[in-house]
């Protein structure tokens, strides 16, 4: 089933495969390579894959035909999946992710808020199982850079247990409980 996102108007494709992973196509670009004999037409696809429990992977694929480019991107996304620790369908703390000129601000939200994020970020949060989050793109709006910045920020998230271990304290001292 294909649907159009509200913010960018680009087509996203949402599928759940037999292995339980959700796939979303973020963008497909038509690219050309100029050679002596003329132009060679091709396509570049950007996709994300998630397990709905905090696992997320991003891939890009290039080919002369759209389905091959999308398949290559999906395969790359499956191979490069990372695990993000979530708490009740949201993040542990606010974070800023950066990649190139793109900056992404992400903040945990209370139950019932939903996914308040634009374009490629919304696709990432949907496939990885985040249900409540506030997010904002700052700087570049290039989908590839936004996806990389979002993954950079998500990768930097630390759980209270990680912070407690680093500081040599108990989790109760960190959380204030």
Curated annotation (Swiss-Prot):
GO terms for molecular function: rRNA binding; structural constituent of ribosome. Pfam families: Ribosomal_S5, Ribosomal_S5_C. Signal peptide: none annotated. Residues 21-84 form the S5 DRBM domain. Disulfide bonds: none annotated. InterPro entries: Ribosomal_Su5_D2-typ_SF (IPR020568), Ribosomal_uS5 (IPR000851), Ribosomal_uS5_bac-type (IPR005712), Ribosomal_uS5_C (IPR005324), Ribosomal_uS5_N (IPR013810), Ribosomal_uS5_N_CS (IPR018192), Ribsml_uS5_D2-typ_fold_subgr (IPR014721). One of its GO terms (cellular component) is small ribosomal subunit. The keyword rRNA-binding applies. SUPFAM superfamilies: dsRNA-binding domain-like, Ribosomal protein S5 domain 2-like. One of its GO terms (biological process) is translation. Keywords: Ribonucleoprotein, Ribosomal protein, RNA-binding, rRNA-binding. With S4 and S12 plays an important role in translational accuracy. Belongs to the universal ribosomal protein uS5 family. The N-terminal domain interacts with the head of the 30S subunit; the C-terminal domain interacts with the body and contacts protein S4. The interaction surface between S4 and S5 is involved in control of translational fidelity. Part of the 30S ribosomal subunit. Contacts proteins S4 and S8. This is Small ribosomal subunit protein uS5. It comes from Nitrosomonas eutropha (strain DSM 101675 / C91 / Nm57).
